């Protein structure tokens, strides 16, 4: 018998909504309060700096001429759809994987909306040391990164033992 939404990982979809809203609200705040490249120092190693990212992580393909917008749109929709199908098929009790998948989906959808609305992703979190700046990023990027780390962690350390525990409960 297929899992109901309450019993499946779809029960965790509230994380997608939370990440998406936090990401979009923070980006709207930046767009309303900052000029492009404007920077406000918050700590001696941390700024809010409004930049536009036409590429992917670390501005990968940002100078590609525009076609990458549609490639990244297809990738975001594809991965979000795939992870949603996986959430539907797995137990709600797989905490780490469900959290990981929903973080990635929320982040992917947050950046997808930027690409579709603006043609670029709004980045503003700027960490630096001296004159060396880490590439600016946003809440969606952070969620995707944390989700990816959790997926990798789970694949090396926990997936089989958590699956065994879930099957024992049934």
UniProtKB/Swiss-Prot annotation:
What pathway or pathways are given for this protein in its record?
A: Protein modification; lipoprotein biosynthesis (signal peptide cleavage)
**GO MF terms, alphabetically ordered:** aspartic-type endopeptidase activity; endopeptidase activity
Q: Give any Pfam family that matches.
A: Peptidase_A8
What's the chief localization of this chain? membrane
Under which main EC class is this enzyme filed?
hydrolase
Q: Which GO terms describe its biological process?
A: proteolysis
Task: Provide the membrane topology annotation.
Answer: Multi-pass membrane protein
What's its EC? Answer: 3.4.23.36
**Keyword terms, alphabetized:** Aspartyl protease, Cell inner membrane, Cell membrane, Hydrolase, Membrane, Protease, Transmembrane, Transmembrane helix
Compartments (UniProt record)? Cell inner membrane
Record's GO cellular component, any one? plasma membrane
Membrane-spanning segments = 12-32, 67-87, 93-113, 137-157
Catalyzes what?
A: Release of signal peptides from bacterial membrane prolipoproteins. Hydrolyzes -Xaa-Yaa-Zaa-|-(S,diacylglyceryl)Cys-, in which Xaa is hydrophobic (preferably Leu), and Yaa (Ala or Ser) and Zaa (Gly or Ala) have small, neutral side chains
Q: Has keyword Amino-acid biosynthesis? A: no
Active site, per annotation? 123, 141
Known function? This protein specifically catalyzes the removal of signal peptides from prolipoproteins.
* Family (UniProt): Belongs to the peptidase A8 family.
The name this protein carries in UniProt is Lipoprotein signal peptidase
Organism phylogeny: Bacteria, Pseudomonadati, Pseudomonadota, Gammaproteobacteria, Alteromonadales
Q: Which gene name belongs to this protein?
A: lspA
């Amino acid at each position: 018998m297929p899992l109901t939404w309450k019993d499946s990982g779809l029960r965790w979809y509230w994380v997608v909504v939370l990440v998406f809203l936090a990401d979009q609200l923070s980006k709207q705040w930046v767009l309303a309060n900052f000029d492009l490249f404007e920077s406000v120092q918050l700590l001696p190693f941390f700024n809010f700096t409004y930049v536009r990212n036409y590429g992917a992580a670390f501005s990968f393909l940002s100078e590609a001429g525009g076609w990458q917008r549609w490639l990244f749109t297809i990738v975001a929709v594809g991965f979000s759809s795939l992870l949603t199908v996986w959430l539907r098929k797995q137990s709600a009790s797989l905490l780490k994987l469900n959290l990981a998948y929903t973080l990635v989906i929320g982040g992917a959808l947050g950046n997808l909306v930027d690409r579709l609305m603006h043609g670029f992703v709004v980045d503003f979190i700027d960490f630096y040391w001296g004159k060396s700046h880490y590439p600016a990023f946003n809440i969606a990027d952070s969620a995707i990164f944390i989700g990816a780390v959790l997926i990798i962690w789970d694949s090396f350390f926990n997936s089989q033992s958590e699956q065994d525990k879930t099957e024992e409960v049934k």
